């Protein structure tokens, strides 16, 4: 009887010792695997952080900020509309209650009070540096100015399309545009952008890479620049203003919750001729210039027709994302 008890005790003791040994072996093996993995990651990160001169960086970031998407299409009663207008409109109207008046008029078209937001901007160059379009539907009013035709056209191209962007370090790298949808977009204070195309030996074509004075000037004293160069050719860039931010961007397609309305002007802005605009229609319209009250009355009358050319999207445009997001 006592022999059986001793045997049982020894079996339990041996089992515990064996189990403890197995656990220690597994622990040592896991430690080895983890340390090995961390060592590989550390070595790899060192190589990844090294400078890599003369490469064409891939585009992986985005200037679009995603917010919660609706699970179903909602009627205008549950949508928001932002109306962007220049300061001169408020100055000319000179009525502290003018937005309240327009809100009541929008109500007659099915837009509840509080669903329409009036957003003021100083001028086209200022707005182009910091466009923020957050509503379900966004209508931008641009008063035609012959001296700002380029800024207006590039602003329309920027806000009417979605872009995938990466920051550019022009002090270390040279860049090339891979196709027609690939552009370099710069925002900031007034500056000049110059480029020097390179041959396969990375020597300048018609310019000297060490002398920016020989570079070809593609933009002069602008706040918003969408630069297009010859595809498949490496370029060295020079930006004269340090505060300007330039990004390597690719046009993804139309931003369908934005419309641009040109106010007045003998010339009509048109960006549909751009081969990257597909289909060849854009949400750009024109209203004859009269008085700002007349302009707003016209927009109220046709707001639902305008919105029907648009579609509610799950992305908003925030220039802060353009500057900082990788």
UniProtKB/Swiss-Prot annotation:
Q: Where is the signal peptide?
A: 1-50
- List each coiled-coil range: none
- One GO CC annotation: viral outer capsid
One Pfam family, please name it.
VP7
Question: Does the keyword section mention Glycosyltransferase?
Answer: no
Name the InterPro entries on file. VP7, VP7_1, VP7_2
List of residues binding Ca(2+) 2: 177, 228-229, 231, 301
Query: What quaternary structure, including any partners, is listed in this protein's UniProt entry?
Result: Homotrimer; disulfide-linked. 2 Ca(2+) ions bound at each subunit interface in the trimer hold the trimer together. Interacts with the intermediate capsid protein VP6. Interacts with the outer capsid protein VP5*.
Q: What is this protein called?
A: Outer capsid glycoprotein VP7
Name the source organism.
Answer: Rotavirus A (isolate RVA/Human/United Kingdom/A64/1987/G10P11[14])
């Amino acid at each position: 009887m006592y022999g059986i008890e001793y045997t049982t005790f020894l079996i339990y003791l041996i089992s515990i010792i064996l189990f403890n040994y197995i656990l220690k072996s597994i622990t040592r093996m896991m430690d080895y695997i983890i340390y090995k993995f961390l060592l590989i990651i550390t070595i790899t990160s060192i190589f990844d952080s090294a400078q890599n001169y003369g490469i064409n960086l891939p585009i992986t970031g985005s200037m679009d900020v995603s917010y919660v998407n609706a699970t179903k299409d909602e009627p205008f009663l549950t949508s928001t509309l932002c109306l962007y207008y220049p300061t001169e409109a408020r100055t000319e109207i000179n009525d502290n209650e003018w937005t309240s008046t327009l809100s009541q008029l929008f109500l007659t078209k099915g837009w509840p009070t509080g669903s329409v937001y009036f957003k003021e901007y100083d001028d086209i160059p200022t707005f182009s540096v910091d466009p923020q379009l957050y509503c379900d539907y966004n209508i931008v009013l641009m008063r035609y100015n012959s001296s700002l035709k380029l800024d207006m056209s590039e602003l329309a191209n920027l806000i009417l399309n979605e872009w995938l962007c990466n920051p550019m370090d022009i002090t270390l790298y040279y860049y090339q545009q891979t196709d027609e949808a690939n552009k370099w977009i710069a925002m900031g204070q007034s500056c000049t952008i110059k480029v020097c195309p390179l041959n396969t030996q990375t020597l300048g074509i018609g310019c000297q890479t060490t002398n920016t004075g020989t570079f070809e000037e593609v933009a002069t004293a602008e706040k918003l620049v969408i630069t297009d160069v010859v595809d498949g050719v490496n370029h060295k860039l020079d930006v004269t203003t340090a505060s300007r931010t330039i990004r390597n961007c690719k046009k993804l397609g139309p931003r369908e919750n934005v419309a641009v309305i040109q106010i007045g002007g003998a010339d009509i802005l048109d960006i549909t001729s751009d081969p990257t605009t597909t289909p060849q229609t854009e949400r750009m319209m024109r209203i004859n210039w009269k008085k700002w009250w007349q302009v707003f009355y016209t927009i109220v009358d046709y707001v639902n027709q305008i919105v029907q050319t648009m579609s509610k999207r799950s992305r908003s445009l925030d220039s802060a994302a353009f500057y900082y997001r990788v």
